[in-house]
Curated annotation (Swiss-Prot):
Species name: Shewanella frigidimarina (strain NCIMB 400)
Keywords associated with the record: Autocatalytic cleavage, DNA damage, DNA repair, DNA replication, DNA-binding, Hydrolase, Repressor, SOS response, Transcription, Transcription regulation
E.C. number(s) listed in UniProt: 3.4.21.88
SUPFAM superfamilies the record matches: LexA/Signal peptidase, Winged helix' DNA-binding domain
GO molecular function, one term: serine-type endopeptidase activity
Known function: Represses a number of genes involved in the response to DNA damage (SOS response), including recA and lexA. In the presence of single-stranded DNA, RecA interacts with LexA causing an autocatalytic cleavage which disrupts the DNA-binding part of LexA, leading to derepression of the SOS regulon and eventually DNA repair.
Encoding gene, per UniProt annotation: lexA
Lineage per the UniProt record: Bacteria, Pseudomonadati, Pseudomonadota, Gammaproteobacteria, Alteromonadales
The name this protein goes by in its record: LexA repressor
Pfam families: LexA_DNA_bind, Peptidase_S24
Family according to the record: Belongs to the peptidase S24 family.
Catalyzed reactions per annotation: Hydrolysis of Ala-|-Gly bond in repressor LexA
UniProt DNA-binding region: 28-48
Length: 204
């Protein structure tokens, strides 16, 4: 590979760090904003130079269409997320316990990460202790969907219901009461949508 200019090296580091912290590459606009470019087009020119030198691959037609070459991807497959630190992105690299060779596209929509189920609060719909829950990363939810939510930095899997400014996170087990979240005084973040279950990881 041809050597990088200091600016190209800075952009490559930004791309790698963004993928490690959020699981996604940055958009052109995000690169321009963080590095002080006047426009996303300036970032695009640097990305083209990085691609020409073989440090990244550009996938047309998507704002985050940047990929590291396969040899740069130390780990592949779906990441299994372990304990999530308060205030940290759920896909931050330090939260990844290991990677499983699971095709994300076997789930609809495609899975972005796996979460190990703790407890039996969702047992009535077949989500059991020790299962691996496949999750599609998203930040909004509709009533009735099973979501991974972060409430005051606790991560939980529940069925979502919103009534005005109040959100109810329902268990699928009569032994558990709903979690009530008043958005006027509490924080709630939707981390993703449950899209499938791998039973106890037996076949992995």
């Amino acid at each position: 590979m041809r050597p990088l200019t200091p600016r190209q090296a800075e952009i490559l580091d930004l791309i790698k760090n963004n993928i490690a912290e959020t699981g996604m590459p940055p958009t052109r606009a995000e690169i321009a904003n963080r590095l002080g470019f006047k426009s996303a087009n300036a970032a695009e020119e640097h990305l083209k130079a990085l691609a020409k030198k073989g440090f990244i691959e550009i996938m047309p037609g998507t704002s985050r269409g940047i990929r590291l070459p396969q040899e740069e991807q130390v780990e592949t497959g779906l990441p299994l997320i372990g304990q999530v630190a308060a205030g940290e992105p759920i896909l931050a690299q330090e939260h990844v316990e290991q990677y499983y060779q699971v095709d994300p596209n076997m789930f609809k929509p495609a899975a972005d990460f796996l979460l190990r189920v703790r407890g039996d609060s969702m047992k009535n719909i077949g989500i059991l202790e020790g299962d691996l829950l496949a999750v599609h990363k998203m930040q909004q939810a509709r009533n009735g969907q099973v979501v991974v939510a972060r409430v005051d930095d606790d991560v939980t899997v529940k069925r979502f219901e919103q009534k005005g400014n109040v959100i109810y996170l329902h268990a699928e087990n009569e032994d558990y009461n709903p979690i009530k979240v008043d958005l006027s005084c509490q924080s709630l973040t939707i981390e993703g949508l449950a899209v499938g279950v791998i039973r106890n990881g037996d076949w992995l």
